[in-house]
Amino acid sequence: SPLDLPIHMHAWERYFHADDRDVVVQLAVLHAQFEILHPFLDGNGRLGRLLIPVFLYERGVLTRPAFYLSAWLETHRDEYYRHLRALGREPQAWNAWCVFFLKGVIEQAEENGRRARQALELYNTLKQRIIARTNSQFAVPLLDFMFARPVFRSTDIQWQGPFPSRPTLAELVRALRESGDLLLLVPGSGQRPAVY
């Protein structure tokens, strides 16, 4: 009943802050309960998915709230809803739900690890190539900046430590563009800086 929603949300919030033995199982239960309670007219799914990294971060499992299960849940959408619908009807549904959810967390974590390894491999490849091509002490700081800001304006380039003169920086950017390591998205014009 909608009149009982505040009571249920209060209980949900208490469980959110409770110390459970297994944080990921607690997360599985919290996520399902939030989706079942459906407290808002719109956005419950998005908010329910956003609560996953927030909860893991709050519990110290993540150093940043940056673990998103959305892609995995979308891939397994039919099974996801089937498990959620079964929670109120089948005695073993909570166990099946937790197994399903934990499988998703594991598979998404493995995919995130694979992508992180690919990004590191790309970084190391580019690092060696850029150092060899530019022979500049500023090549690695520029590469670090590019990885931190994959899309940037030419006027945004900055980092801690020694910074090159504008002509040196322009030469570095030109060398990276010519080698294909930096893609010009929007040419600069007048007062408008280029976007890479």
What spans do the regions from the language model cover?
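Short acidic, hydrophobic short linear motifs in intrinsically disordered regions
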Residues: 139-143, 148-161
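Phosphate/pyrophosphate-binding active-site loops
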Residues: 1-116
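A short, conserved structural fragment
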Residues: 177-188
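Conserved alpha/beta core segments of nucleic-acid transaction machinery
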Residues: 104-138
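Minor-groove-contacting beta-hairpin "wing" of winged helix-turn-helix DNA-binding domains
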Residues: 189-196
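Conserved, hydrophobic alpha-helical core segments of structured domains
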Residues: 12, 135-139, 192
